[in-house]
Amino acid sequence: YRALLETLKRDPMHRAAQVQPEIEFALARQAEMATIQNALTAGELPLRVTHNDTKLNNVLLDAKTRKALCVIDLDTVMPGSSLYDFGDSIRFGAATAAEDEKDIFKMEMSLDRFRVFTRGYVRACPGLTAKELELLPMGAKTMTMECGVRFLTDYLDGDHYFAVHRDGQNLDRARTQFKLVADMEKKWDEMRKIVEEEAK
């Protein structure tokens, strides 16, 4: 959020006035997005080795069997929260539309995909603490918001960080991520229930 706030002060491309709804959406959730970091700092969550870019394209698959062989792109590995890896996987894998989809109404979070991934994750990670399990949905929301804020910041700053192939692509990316967050908020109780059911 620091980068967003600094970019808003400068407004180098004079784009802020055009994206007030997106800015307001991001700022309204700023305090909540510190939940996981605050829990880490307070010692309520364990520090774990995390990948920090947990997308399907970072899993090497066998060409014949399509079974996973190993995780790749290890330059992002560092200490962190398991919730970040879980959350980024949900952001990427449970989304119903492409990251830069222009029609944000195509973007939702699939509860079916959320359930399947959650089931696999908690079974593969039997050492997750009760607090980690409780905050799994927050991991998904946090990582999705973080990406949305980063895309919005880059759009406001002139599209220097994320590669763009058309005008407004980073803004579209921000909007899809914010739509995904809004859909998670609508489905929040269901997400929490799924985690409880799959963690039994």
Functional labels for PLM-detected ranges:
Residues K9-M13, T76, G93-A94, D100-E101, ...:
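Phosphate/dinucleotide-binding and metal-coordinating scaffold of catalytic cores
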